[in-house]
Amino acid sequence: MSKTAVKDSATEKTKLSESEQHYFNSYDHYGIHEEMLQDTVRTLSYRNAIIQNKDLFKDKIVLDVGCGTGILSMFAAKHGAKHVIGVDMSSIIEMAKELVELNGFSDKITLLRGKLEDVHLPFPKVDIIISEWMGYFLLYESMMDTVLYARDHYLVEGGLIFPDKCSIHLAGLEDSQYKDEKLNYWQDVYGFDYSPFVPLVLHEPIVDTVERNNVNTTSDKLIEFDLNTVKISDLAFKSNFKLTAKRQDMINGIVTWFDIVFPAPKGKRPVEFSTGPHAPYTHWKQTIFYFPDDLDAETGDTIEGELVCSPNEKNNRDLNIKISYKFESNGIDGNSRSRKNEGSYLMH
């Protein structure tokens, strides 16, 4: 294969659902790619993982799922891959073609436009899959489904997936001022009662940066996925958690984040990164779920709960999330401060 080739899309966009069209169109503009490229935690982690495993990439066929501007494809080609196939549905792949040619990788990288399920790969099997598929709360936009499709249809037995391990974590947080501002605003809007908006506001998780000192409980690992073995059905999950208050404080909700781990040569520490409040900033930030009530916690009080996550029935790239919890408080007035409640949320 001697020429980078982007032909007409293998997928006819007009035949996609409106939500699918909106999703792919959102990646047409350079701005979203600029934000991802400038996320050095994200981009350098991929580069460093490829460099650490350059012996494994040498002379291998690599599939880049959702290649965007082609940065991961070029990392792989630069560090020894025999050939890289980049697949993307959005029009940004036209720019990727220009970038690949400009940087001298036309003979090593083939770009295909379309959904992975629709394109025809120039090789029957690949040795390595690379993909930056993660969304907010890890699973939002459900691109992991496509990576698993690539694994099941194209990856050789014993092939590698970069990254291959991921986990979702959560902790309690104090965020009274911001929560009050968001909710109290609707009590008096230019002299009118707009309080019916309050449940709608609570129903929507917030993606934002949480300061480390706002986290006021222990953390817990909600779930872990191994991309070598996980099934699409596993991505709809139910998981229990337990958190313990680390100080006397209000607990207004939970903050969630995810951790990522790449394969590593035997005896080497793997490249990994976290998107939590304790870690350097990433464009994924954190995802906040406000509780229906505020918990008045003393040191050692506990929250035990269950989080249920599933694709939304109208748009499977959105997520339905339900959090039920039991807050048990100690002390003289512990009974009056204890709570049992649940909240339902939609990430869209």
Curated annotation (Swiss-Prot):
Cite the InterPro entries for this sequence. Answer: Arg_MeTrfase (IPR025799), PRMT_dom (IPR055135), SAM-dependent_MTases_sf (IPR029063)
What does this protein do, in the record's words?
A: S-adenosyl-L-methionine-dependent protein-arginine N-methyltransferase that catalyzes both the mono- and asymmetric (type I) dimethylation of the guanidino nitrogens of arginine residues in a variety of RNA-binding proteins such as heterogeneous nuclear ribonucleoproteins (hnRNPs) and small nuclear ribonucleoproteins (snRNPs). Methylates NAB2, NPL3, HRP1 and YRA1, shuttling hnRNPs involved in mRNA processing and export, facilitating their export out of the nucleus.
A GO biological process of this protein is: chromatin remodeling
Further remarks about this protein from its record:
Present with 37600 molecules/cell in log phase SD medium.
Species per Swiss-Prot/TrEMBL record? Saccharomyces cerevisiae (strain ATCC 204508 / S288c) (Baker's yeast)
Say which enzyme class the record assigns: transferase
User: In which residues is S-adenosyl-L-methionine bound?
Assistant: H33, R42, G66, D88, E117
Q: Which family does it belong to?
A: Belongs to the class I-like SAM-binding methyltransferase superfamily. Protein arginine N-methyltransferase family.
Quaternary organization: Homodimer. The dimers can then associate to form a ring-shaped homohexamer. Interacts with NPL3, BRE5, MTR4, SNF2, SUM1, and SSD1.
Q: Where is the active site?
A: E132, E141
Annotated localization: Nucleus
Catalysed reactions, as listed in the record: L-arginyl-[protein] + S-adenosyl-L-methionine = N(omega)-methyl-L-arginyl-[protein] + S-adenosyl-L-homocysteine + H(+); L-arginyl-[protein] + 2 S-adenosyl-L-methionine = N(omega),N(omega)-dimethyl-L-arginyl-[protein] + 2 S-adenosyl-L-homocysteine + 2 H(+)
Q: Which GO terms describe its molecular function?
A: histone methyltransferase activity; identical protein binding; protein-arginine N-methyltransferase activity; protein-arginine omega-N asymmetric methyltransferase activity; protein-arginine omega-N monomethyltransferase activity
Per UniProt, which keywords does this protein have?
Methyltransferase, Nucleus, S-adenosyl-L-methionine, Transferase
The segment(s) forming the SAM-dependent MTase PRMT-type domain are: 20-322
Entry keyword Transport = no
Record annotation: effect of changing E18V: Cold-sensitive; reduces catalytic activity more than 20-fold at 14 degrees Celsius
Q: Which Gene3D superfamilies match?
A: Hnrnp arginine n-methyltransferase1 (2.70.160.11), Vaccinia Virus protein VP39 (3.40.50.150)
Asked if Lyase is a keyword of the record, the answer is no
Question: Which PROSITE patterns does the protein's record reference?
Answer: SAM_MT_PRMT
As recorded in UniProt, its EC number(s) are 2.1.1.319
Classification from the root reads: Eukaryota, Fungi, Dikarya, Ascomycota, Saccharomycotina
Example of a GO cellular component annotation carried by this entry? nucleus
**Name of the molecule in the record:** Protein arginine N-methyltransferase 1
Q: What is its main location?
A: nucleus
